[in-house]
């Protein structure tokens, strides 16, 4: 199974590392360091499967020899803390063939390193038995200028150190405890060296990690894809494994137990158990979802049955529904016509009002522009000796009045009053028309919108309602009728009491088991009928007595009233 691994480290002179020594280690070749006069030969050639060097555009041809390349960068970097190279280690998927390994690795180097001006040497390794395939990429830590073929400049710059509030940190004199001052008395601030090398930036390192995952996934099946993100970034709660390393695996191959390998085995068992639990929960939730969907389907079928049973009833209201829809559309169009007439009348009334009046903005703008026009008229009509002075005065007045106009009419776009009399008069006409149009725009806009709505309403009124609309309204009318009938039946139903009128007539045939026999009472049928008749007689007597109390004449025979002697 393919795994993801990519690590980047510095070849730092401060920690005793050398680019030439690292080159000898990854290539398994003998390398001479020209700067120090030392020769490195780490051997282990049996683990090295392939070595290659890829150069950017404009690089010298002799840099194709990795020993020449990294001796050159060692000689160019003279600082005691210099970092002449970077080392990138990537895990190669076991699913790759030897040719795919080379293609993926060289494509990755060209796209991410050579394209930015970096030269690099790679070496493909395994453990000597075909396991643990991986690659070392040694990158010269300075870009090559494509124009000159030499090393690029400006690797770093100085920047101020900032505190947590984003403010500069003062440089304190340890003797006095005060902030240091330079020779001119200026305060000193802490500064630090910031690398301008893209390989030292976090964004570039993230890009390298993501690009390696994409390069491998382009050649892997979907079931063997790798992900450059951490488990936390992926939103997974699985525990990540730790790096085992060559020494730990060597202990395991020798029959021992490595602490790192044992830790990873426990982590994998825990992750496998968690994955199995999650898979089982997913299967249970899927089954619950299927059952829920089935129940929803049954409920919908039950809800659809009353609609299907009511289908024949809506036909009775089909004609009424169609006429109602047509009437509603006609009423809507008529209402829009009335609103449109009112809106047009409002526009005419406002236009009439404008002939004799004006808004505050209108009057203010006229007064402001008239002042500028008067100054420009005086300049135009002035004599030869005063014309220059009055023209300058007209320009000054036009500028001042333009400022006043911007304050009086803030929404007006063109507020620059010309100093020329003819242009100022034309500006006056344009401005007053703009104020008039701005005041009328809500009313004319309402008229246009009502005209559009009326056109749509008249078009809809001229069309027949669709069958779906007719059926929907007819169904609602049928439902409303059924609810009204149900309420009427409930209102007319008498309340149950002991004095309900009884049907005393005996059915022609009770059948084998009459209602009286089903009660299993000891009384006979004749006894029960007698009791029921007595109960009815008592109730009839009570009703007659109540009637006599209300109207005493109702119980006596009617008497003739006349003028007898």
Curated annotation (Swiss-Prot):
Q: Which UniProt keywords apply?
A: Conjugation, Mobility protein, Plasmid
Q: Which InterPro entries does this UniProt record tie to the protein? A: MobA_MobL
- The record lists the organism as Bifidobacterium longum (strain NCC 2705)
The source's superkingdom equals: Bacteria
The job of this chain, per UniProt, is described as: Might be involved in plasmid transfer.
> Which protein family is it in?
Belongs to the MobA/MobL family.
Outline the segment boundaries, as ranges, of region: Disordered: 479-565
State the protein's name: Probable mobilization protein MobA
Q: Please list the residue ranges that the record marks as compositionally biased, kind Basic and acidic residues.
A: 524-549
High-level lineage: Bacteria, Bacillati, Actinomycetota, Actinomycetes, Bifidobacteriales
- Regions of compositional bias (Acidic residues) in chain numbering: 497-511
KW DNA-binding (keyword) present = no
Looking up Pfam families in the UniProt record yields: MobA_MobL
């Amino acid at each position: 199974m393919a795994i993801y691994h990519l690590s980047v480290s510095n070849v730092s002179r401060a920690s005793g590392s050398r680019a030439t020594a690292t080159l000898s280690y990854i290539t398994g070749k003998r390398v001479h360091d020209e700067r120090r006069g030392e020769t490195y030969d780490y051997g282990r050639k049996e683990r090295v499967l392939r070595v290659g060097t890829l150069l950017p555009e404009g690089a010298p041809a002799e840099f194709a020899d990795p020993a020449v390349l990294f001796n050159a960068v060692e000689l160019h970097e003279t600082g005691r803390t210099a970092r002449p190279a970077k080392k990138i280690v990537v895990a190669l998927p076991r699913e790759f063939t030897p040719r795919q390994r080379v293609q993926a690795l060289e494509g990755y180097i060209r796209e991410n390193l050579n394209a930015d001006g970096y030269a690099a040497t790679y070496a493909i390794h395994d453990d000597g038995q075909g396991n643990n395939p991986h690659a070392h990429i040694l990158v010269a830590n300075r870009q090559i200028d494509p124009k000159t073929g030499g090393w690029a400049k400006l690797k770093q710059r100085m920047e101020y150190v900032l505190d947590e509030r984003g403010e500069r940190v003062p440089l304190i004199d340890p003797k006095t405890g005060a902030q240091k001052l330079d020779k001119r008395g200026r305060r000193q601030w802490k500064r630090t060296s910031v690398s301008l090398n893209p390989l030292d930036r976090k964004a570039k390192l993230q890009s390298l990690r993501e690009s390696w995952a994409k390069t491998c996934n382009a050649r892997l099946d979907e079931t063997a894809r790798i992900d450059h993100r951490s488990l936390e970034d992926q939103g997974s709660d699985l525990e990540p494994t730790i790096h085992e390393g060559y020494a730990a695996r060597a202990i395991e191959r020798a029959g021992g137990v490595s602490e790192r390998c044992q830790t990873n085995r426990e982590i994998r068992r825990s992750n496998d158990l968690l994955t199995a639990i999650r898979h089982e929960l997913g299967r249970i939730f899927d089954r619950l979802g299927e059952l829920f969907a089935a129940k929803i389907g049954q409920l919908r079928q039950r809800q659809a049955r009353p609609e299907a049973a009511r289908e024949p009833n809506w036909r009775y209201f089909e004609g009424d529904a169609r006429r109602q829809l047509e009437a509603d559309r006609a009423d809507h169009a008529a209402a829009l016509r009335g609103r449109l007439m009112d809106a047009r009348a409002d526009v005419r009334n406002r236009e009439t009002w404008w002939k004799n009046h004006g808004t505050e903005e209108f009057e203010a703008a006229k007064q402001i522009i008239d002042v500028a026009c008067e100054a420009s008229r005086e300049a135009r009509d002035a004599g030869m000796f005063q014309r220059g002075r009055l023209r300058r005065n007209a320009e000054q007045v036009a500028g001042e009045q333009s400022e006043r106009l911007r304050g009086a009419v803030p929404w007006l776009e063109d507020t620059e009053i010309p100093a020329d009399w003819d242009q100022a008069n034309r500006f006056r006409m344009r401005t007053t028309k703009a104020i008039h149009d701005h005041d009328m725009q809500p009313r004319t806009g309402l008229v246009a919108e009502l005209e559009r709505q009326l056109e749509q309403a008249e078009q809809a009124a001229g069309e027949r309602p669709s069958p779906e609309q007719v059926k929907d309204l007819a169904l609602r009318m049928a439902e409303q009728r059924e609810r009204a009938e149900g309420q009427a039946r409930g209102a007319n139903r008498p309340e149950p009491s002991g004095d309900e009128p009884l049907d005393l007539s005996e059915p022609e045939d009770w059948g084998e088991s009459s209602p009286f026999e089903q009660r299993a009472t000891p009384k006979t049928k004749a006894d029960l009928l007698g009791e029921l008749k007595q109960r009815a007689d008592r109730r009839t007597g009570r009703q007659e007595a109540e009637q006599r109390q209300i109207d005493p004449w109702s119980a006596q025979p009617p008497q003739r009233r006349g003028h007898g002697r």
